[in-house]
Amino acid sequence: EEETPLKDEL
Amino acid sequence: MNIFRFLGDISHLSAIIILLLKIWKSRSCAGISGKSQLLFAIVFTTRYLDLFTNFISFYNTSMKVVYVASSYATVWMIYSKFKATYDGNHDTFRVEFLIVPTAILSFLVNHDFTPLEILWTFSIYLESVAILPQLFMVSKTGEAETITSHYLFALGIYRTLYLFNWIWRYQFEEFFDLIAIVAGLVQTVLYCDFFYLYITKVLKGKKLSLPA
């Protein structure tokens, strides 16, 4: 499974 | 973090502070759409639930806390503290037309079918259209105070700067998040008309007013 994108943005 | 992302965050923060100060100093929320502010409070609440599950950085956490707290402060000022000055008669956009479709879309198009991920996606979609009640109010009254125009410009340019940030990240980090990019494009497009008026009128010292 693809990782969901890292939520490092606001 | 690249320069576009940083400037985007700063302009977002500036927008929030400009609005808070405008209302607090003038003791009035005339010309401000309470509905848009309510939508932004929902946006921040549903997006930053990861405050409880993930720690990314001190910067990240503090900005999120400031965004959430200030959005609630703004809503409180409009609907409680300075309620008498709130121009509800002109704030007539039907927010269910924004909330329902974005909620449905977030169930259909998301990265992962989990509660946190769906709420995050919902917040991205809702943010892209949350300014519509405010823009509707400006078009209905045909004018906006200059300080409100500065607020709208700072808020609009923030997502535009994020678009450049995403181009940068795709180029140098091979990172991209299609949901955020498409929503960010929609969000930016909604401001284009306003950007034009801002540059041609407000920056030349005139008040923003629309032809009757």
Curated annotation (Swiss-Prot), chain B:
Topological domains, Lumenal: 1-4, 53-58, 111-116, 169-178
Stretch list, region Important for recycling of cargo proteins with the sequence motif K-D-E-L from the Golgi to the endoplasmic reticulum: 204-207
Localization in the cell: Golgi apparatus membrane; Cytoplasmic vesicle, COPI-coated vesicle membrane; Endoplasmic reticulum membrane; Endoplasmic reticulum-Golgi intermediate compartment membrane
Main location: Golgi
Gene Ontology molecular-function annotations: ER retention sequence binding; KDEL sequence binding
Keywords for the protein's UniProt record, in alphabetical order: Cytoplasmic vesicle, Endoplasmic reticulum, ER-Golgi transport, Golgi apparatus, Membrane, Protein transport, Receptor, Transmembrane, Transmembrane helix, Transport
Topological domains, Cytoplasmic: 25-32, 80-92, 136-149, 200-212
Pfam families referenced in this protein's UniProt entry, alphabetically: ER_lumen_recept
Gene Ontology terms describing biological process: protein retention in ER lumen; protein transport; retrograde vesicle-mediated transport, Golgi to endoplasmic reticulum
Topological category with respect to the lipid bilayer: Multi-pass membrane protein
Residues the UniProt record annotates as site (Interaction with the K-D-E-L motif on target proteins): R5, E117
A GO-annotated cellular component: endoplasmic reticulum-Golgi intermediate compartment membrane
Region called Interaction with the K-D-E-L motif on target proteins, residue ranges: 47-48, 159-169
Entry's transmembrane regions: 5-24, 33-52, 59-79, 93-110, 117-135, 150-168, 179-199
Protein task: Receptor for the C-terminal sequence motif K-D-E-L that is present on endoplasmic reticulum resident proteins and that mediates their recycling from the Golgi back to the endoplasmic reticulum.
Protein name (Swiss-Prot/TrEMBL): ER lumen protein-retaining receptor 1-B
Native source organism of the sequence: Xenopus laevis
Organism classification: Eukaryota, Metazoa, Chordata, Craniata, Vertebrata
Gene name linked to the record: kdelr1-b
